[in-house]
Amino acid sequence: MLGLIGKKVGMTQIFQKNGIVVPVTVIEFQPNYIIGKKTVDRDGYSALIAGSVDLKSSKVSKPIKGQYKSLKDIEPKRYVIELKGLDGYDAGDEIKVDVFKSVKYVDVTGTTKGKGFQGAMKRHNFSGGPSSHGSKFHRHLGGTGQATTPARTFKGTKMAGRMGGNQQTIQNLEVVLIDEEKRALLVKGAVPGAKGSFVVVKKSKK
């Protein structure tokens, strides 16, 4: 499956020929290299391993250095992904943004913005209690343990807690523009994560 590691630059808007304004997210790609292969005989399935963004030399361990010995002029990478069903590439080859030329829709995976510790209303969209005078609670969670049966709170019950900082995928984002010179891709709508965060862009599954 087609895929690249990119950086979310931010959002802007462009005008179509008919005058309609389209909100877009700009995703910029640093060079993505094939750094390895997985085979059916050795790993049980076939896939390509792609990497992007050089890792700081202080963070490169000896085992990681050994993995890159056979690759000339390619430094150890910070971000690594697996691409299944993508043929025609060998170790050391670069995957460029033009692979999305024939693609109309993409899935984008990123890490959502961290919001810190939040209450149930913000975190889970609960309605809360009555706002009127005399109510004992306004933004509280309410009961979590039912009555005599089961007389306990089940694991996984929605409560207040840390919000954000999770991996999230937005599917079927329309590809609006590809700029090969600037290694940029413009997709319609919003993408998970803050400006400058790294995302994985893949051809849409659906």
Curated annotation (Swiss-Prot):
The answer, when asked if Ribonucleoprotein is one of the entry's keywords, is: yes
Spell out the subunit comment.
Part of the 50S ribosomal subunit. Forms a cluster with proteins L14 and L19.
A GO term for molecular function = rRNA binding
Q: Which PANTHER family match?
A: 50S RIBOSOMAL PROTEIN L3 (PTHR11229), LARGE RIBOSOMAL SUBUNIT PROTEIN UL3C (PTHR11229:SF16)
* NCBIfam families in the cross-refs: L3_bact (TIGR03625)
The lineage, from the top, is:
Bacteria, Pseudomonadati, Spirochaetota, Spirochaetia, Spirochaetales
Look up the record and give one Gene Ontology term from the biological process aspect.
translation
Write out the function statement from the record: One of the primary rRNA binding proteins, it binds directly near the 3'-end of the 23S rRNA, where it nucleates assembly of the 50S subunit.
Which keywords are on file for this protein? Ribonucleoprotein, Ribosomal protein, RNA-binding, rRNA-binding
Top-rank taxon: Bacteria
- Gene3D superfamilies in UniProt: Translation factors
The keyword Magnesium appears for this protein: no
Q: Name one GO cellular component term.
A: cytosolic large ribosomal subunit
What name does UniProt use for this protein? Large ribosomal subunit protein uL3
Family classification: Belongs to the universal ribosomal protein uL3 family.
Q: Where is this region: Disordered?
A: 127-151
Q: Mind telling me which InterPro entries this protein's record contains?
A: Ribosomal_uL3, Ribosomal_uL3_bac/org-type, Ribosomal_uL3_CS, Transl_B-barrel_sf
Q: Which Pfam families match?
A: Ribosomal_L3
